[in-house]
């Protein structure tokens, strides 16, 4: 299943005064992302502040993105949690909305399942889901790492179509790519590892930086696929300071700051996250301005 090369892990626009998910701002952001290099969108993922969105807010968000998208980009809904039964129920509900192409299921966090538990969790969700499942391995947040052997086993299940790999372990990612079928999609979950993962056979990136430099991310990937490796490497090096700067404080505060500065109004982050202070904002803006020099 081809979900695209550059998939943006979309921030969730919040009205700054009402502290509510904002329909008008969602519409503006989705159009901006599609026009600027996004093949697909992940909605209500980590970057979308899913832990601080209510169930009803997520449904509202999904409905508005589906309506605005109108079939242009691939849409992936974040429906995972650390409760298997709730994940299944929510995934089934989202499938009834129509317009979603897949779901992103995060590794269960806090309760620390072992590898057998992780396999059983994803297998149960995949069996129950009417939508294709993308695994989300992010041990820095979930505490547990989905080992390559577990992902390779899961990749054999017919409804599991890919993985967003945010472990940062290139050896493990290489093993997954080598031992899964060609139609199993392996995406970098870290912007800075996009090019290295492409080099070992990956399919693309689920990106944060593409909010700001989506066309440049596309250019890097396309250059690599044309065999212009040096050009791709040059673009990678040019974008690297911004990729790192977007995680200088907890995500997605830096991305929301830059979007707001550029006139793409997405509002603040929600507590317990906090927005950038003046010094942090100035440093980040300087990094962005340095890209054009």
From Swiss-Prot:
<dbReference type="GO" id="GO:0009089">
    <property type="term" value="P:lysine biosynthetic process via diaminopimelate"/>
</dbReference>
<dbReference type="GO" id="GO:0005829">
    <property type="term" value="C:cytosol"/>
</dbReference>
<keyword id="KW-0456">Lyase</keyword>
<comment type="pathway">
    <text>Amino-acid biosynthesis; L-lysine biosynthesis via DAP pathway; (S)-tetrahydrodipicolinate from L-aspartate: step 3/4.</text>
</comment>
<keyword id="KW-0963">Cytoplasm</keyword>
<comment type="similarity">
    <text>Belongs to the DapA family.</text>
</comment>
<dbReference type="InterPro" id="IPR002220">
    <property type="entry name" value="DapA-like"/>
</dbReference>
<dbReference type="Pfam" id="PF00701">
    <property type="entry name" value="DHDPS"/>
</dbReference>
<comment type="function">
    <text>Catalyzes the condensation of (S)-aspartate-beta-semialdehyde [(S)-ASA] and pyruvate to 4-hydroxy-tetrahydrodipicolinate (HTPA).</text>
</comment>
<feature type="binding site">
    <location>
        <position position="47"/>
    </location>
    <ligand>
        <name>pyruvate</name>
    </ligand>
</feature>
<keyword id="KW-0457">Lysine biosynthesis</keyword>
<dbReference type="InterPro" id="IPR005263">
    <property type="entry name" value="DapA"/>
</dbReference>
<feature type="active site" description="Proton donor/acceptor">
    <location>
        <position position="136"/>
    </location>
</feature>
<keyword id="KW-0704">Schiff base</keyword>
<feature type="active site" description="Schiff-base intermediate with substrate">
    <location>
        <position position="164"/>
    </location>
</feature>
<dbReference type="InterPro" id="IPR020625">
    <property type="entry name" value="Schiff_base-form_aldolases_AS"/>
</dbReference>
<dbReference type="InterPro" id="IPR020624">
    <property type="entry name" value="Schiff_base-form_aldolases_CS"/>
</dbReference>
<keyword id="KW-0028">Amino-acid biosynthesis</keyword>
<feature type="site" description="Part of a proton relay during catalysis">
    <location>
        <position position="110"/>
    </location>
</feature>
<feature type="binding site">
    <location>
        <position position="206"/>
    </location>
    <ligand>
        <name>pyruvate</name>
    </ligand>
</feature>
<protein>
    <recommendedName>
        <fullName>4-hydroxy-tetrahydrodipicolinate synthase</fullName>
        <ecNumber>4.3.3.7</ecNumber>
    </recommendedName>
</protein>
<feature type="site" description="Part of a proton relay during catalysis">
    <location>
        <position position="46"/>
    </location>
</feature>
<comment type="subunit">
    <text>Homotetramer; dimer of dimers.</text>
</comment>
<dbReference type="InterPro" id="IPR013785">
    <property type="entry name" value="Aldolase_TIM"/>
</dbReference>
<dbReference type="GO" id="GO:0019877">
    <property type="term" value="P:diaminopimelate biosynthetic process"/>
</dbReference>
<keyword id="KW-0220">Diaminopimelate biosynthesis</keyword>
<dbReference type="GO" id="GO:0008840">
    <property type="term" value="F:4-hydroxy-tetrahydrodipicolinate synthase activity"/>
</dbReference>
């Amino acid at each position: 299943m081809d979900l695209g090369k550059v998939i943006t892990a979309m921030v969730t626009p919040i009205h700054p005064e009402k502290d509510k998910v904002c329909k008008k701002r969602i519409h503006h952001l989705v159009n901006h992302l599609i026009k600027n290099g996004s093949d697909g969108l992940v909605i209500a993922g980590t970057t979308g502040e899913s832990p601080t969105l209510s169930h009803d807010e997520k449904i509202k968000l999904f409905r508005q993105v589906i309506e605005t998208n109108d079939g242009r980009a691939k849409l992936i809904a974040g429906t995972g949690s650390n409760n298997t039964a709730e994940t299944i129920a929510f995934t089934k509900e989202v499938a009834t909305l129509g317009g979603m192409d897949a779901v992103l299921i995060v590794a269960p966090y806090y309760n620390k399942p072992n590898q057998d538990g992780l396999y059983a969790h994803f297998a149960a969700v995949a069996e129950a889901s009417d939508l294709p499942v993308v695994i989300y391995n992010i041990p820095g947040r979930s505490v547990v790492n989905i080992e390559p052997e577990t992902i390779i086993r899961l990749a054999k299940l017919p409804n599991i179509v890919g993985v967003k790999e945010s472990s940062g372990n290139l050896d493990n990612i290489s093993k997954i790519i080598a031992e899964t079928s060609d139609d199993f999609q392996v995406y970098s979950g870290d912007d800075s590892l996009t090019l290295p993962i492409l080099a070992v056979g990956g399919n693309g990136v689920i990106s944060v930086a593409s909010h700001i430099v989506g066309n440049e991310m596309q250019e890097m990937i396309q250059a690599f696929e044309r065999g212009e490796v040096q050009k791709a490497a040059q673009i990678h090096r040019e974008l690297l300071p911004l990729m790192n700067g977007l995680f200088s404080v907890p995500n997605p505060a830096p991305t929301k700051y830059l979007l707001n500065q550029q006139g793409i109004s997405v509002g603040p982050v929600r507590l317990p996250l906090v927005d950038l202070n003046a010094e942090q904002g100035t440093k980040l803006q300087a990094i962005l301005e340095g890209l054009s020099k």
